């Protein structure tokens, strides 16, 4: 039987669901940026809305102060954030009535400020065992997810003009666009966001050079085996004070390792570039998960800078605390459906995780895919039907990715046309590939081509997929190579 020593308090869990759907529901890049801003700040907006309504929530959980159920119960606050991580928010309220009042404020704020962000709320009576309370919260959260239905806060009539993608009522016309309430709020959030060093997607996609610089990359990075680490940090403790302190330290450390330091490294890396193409913007960044959109030419620099920062951090950590992650890169034109492109990036990340799990999730992997002519299948189907036996992806970061980059730089000496011919010959058959290798070797003996090198063969195929954006020389160099 659970010990009821929670001073009448309740512990609540808030979980934003369908985050990617909310962000990528539109293909307008301003609204994607605005949607990501709203999601990033949704809990902060809740705290401010609650304060305006006279509900005091102590959200200063990062200060390092110890948490105590008794101290909270005797404080002047109505609620206190236990910790926030992975898109989840844990709060303790003084009573169930306070929890209900807070939810009413939160719901109204979501409707007025975001329109359709969906948040699942669950609460349990506080006991003296945090781990048991958290387990009950997760179970309740899962139950709500599986049984609840997502409602859209609008109704339409036969005379109502609706958005053709979301079927929400049109409330405003701006810049020759018909906008729903959700779109208006996302654009408003976009206009307010002007973080120095990160570019708006209009700048990233190169709208001024449509057709030549309109390639974007969606990069999804996710930490390996993080659920095990969360369990490990509270393995031999159960009280609220001990567990909360441990989880707060873990959440802050995770954010620094997977988001803050890598983002700083990416900014520093791209600042070295002067071609105007190397720009990026965060879409989601929290805990061990990060989603970026950048000019496709910058994707390789972004990923290498990210993992360099992660490796640098690991040098000062003991083996059992080192952090590892996998990244997926999906490249597409700026007019492609972003929701589909994101799913490909997520599946590329999962492709790396499958390999990493075979090594106890202690290896970083990168996978990529160029969405050339629309997205009609999932990654697994694409690999099985179009690239089986041809690709070496995913790449282990420290050795295999470096080898891939070196091979791409070395083979650029033979020119774009020859690299493309080699990849096309692989698809036709082994004899075609051997013929092309011998032909090119006769002109470029220093290129190191060998028709019997299976590893190099797969590298060449992968290089050909992204040669134009990651390895291509200038037009003058290409002309000289073909002469």
Regions of interest found by a model, annotated:
Residues 1-483:
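Regulatory and interdomain segments flanking nucleotide-handling catalytic cores
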């Amino acid at each position: 039987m659970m010990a009821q020593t929670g001073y009448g308090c309740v512990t609540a869990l808030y979980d934003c669901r369908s985050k990617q759907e909310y962000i990528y529901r539109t293909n307008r890049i301003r609204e994607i940026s605005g949607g990501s801003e709203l999601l990033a700040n949704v809990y902060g907006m809740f705290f401010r809305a609650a304060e305006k309504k006279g509900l005091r929530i102590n959200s200063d959980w990062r200060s390092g102060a110890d948490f105590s159920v008794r101290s909270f119960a005797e404080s002047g606050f109505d609620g206190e954030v236990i910790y926030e991580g992975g898109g989840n928010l844990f709060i303790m309220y003084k009573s169930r009535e306070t929890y209900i009042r807070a939810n009413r404020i939160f719901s109204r704020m979501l409707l007025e400020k975001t329109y359709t962000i969906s948040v699942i709320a669950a609460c349990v009576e506080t006991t003296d065992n945090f781990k048991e309370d958290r387990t009950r919260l997760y179970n309740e959260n899962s139950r709500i997810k599986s049984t609840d239905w997502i409602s859209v806060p609008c109704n339409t009539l036969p005379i109502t003009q609706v958005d053709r993608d979301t079927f929400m009522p049109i409330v405003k016309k701006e810049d020759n666009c018909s906008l729903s309430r959700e779109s208006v709020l996302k654009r408003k959030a976009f206009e307010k966001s002007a973080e120095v060093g990160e570019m708006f997607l209009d700048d990233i996609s190169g709208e001024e050079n449509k057709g030549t610089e309109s390639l974007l990359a969606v990069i999804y990075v996710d930490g390996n085996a993080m659920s095990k680490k969360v369990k490990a940090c509270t393995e031999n403790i159960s009280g609220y004070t001990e567990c909360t302190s441990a989880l707060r330290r873990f959440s802050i450390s995770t954010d620094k390792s997977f988001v803050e330091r890598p983002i700083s490294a990416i900014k520093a890396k791209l600042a070295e570039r002067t071609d105007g193409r190397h720009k990026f913007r965060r879409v989601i960044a929290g805990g061990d998960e990060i989603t970026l959109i950048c000019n496709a030419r910058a994707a390789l620099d972004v990923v290498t800078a990210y993992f360099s920062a992660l490796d640098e951090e690991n040098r000062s950590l003991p083996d059992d605390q080192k952090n590892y992650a996998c990244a997926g890169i999906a490249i597409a034109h700026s007019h492609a459906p972003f929701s589909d492109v994101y799913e490909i990036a997520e599946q590329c990340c999962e492709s790396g995780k499958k390999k990493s799990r075979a090594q106890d999730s202690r290896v970083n992997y990168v996978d990529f895919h160029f969405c050339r002519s629309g997205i009609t299948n999932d990654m697994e189907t694409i690999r099985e039907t179009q690239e089986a036996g041809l690709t070496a992806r995913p790449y282990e970061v420290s050795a295999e990715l470096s080898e891939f980059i070196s091979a791409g730089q070395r083979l650029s000496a033979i020119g774009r046309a020859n690299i493309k011919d080699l990849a096309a010959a692989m698809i036709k058959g082994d004899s075609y590939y051997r013929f092309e290798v011998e032909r090119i070797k006769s002109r470029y003996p220093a290129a190191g081509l060998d028709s019997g090198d299976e590893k190099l063969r797969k590298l060449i195929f992968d290089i050909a997929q992204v040669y134009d954006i990651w390895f291509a020389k200038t037009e003058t160099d290409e002309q000289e190579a073909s002469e």
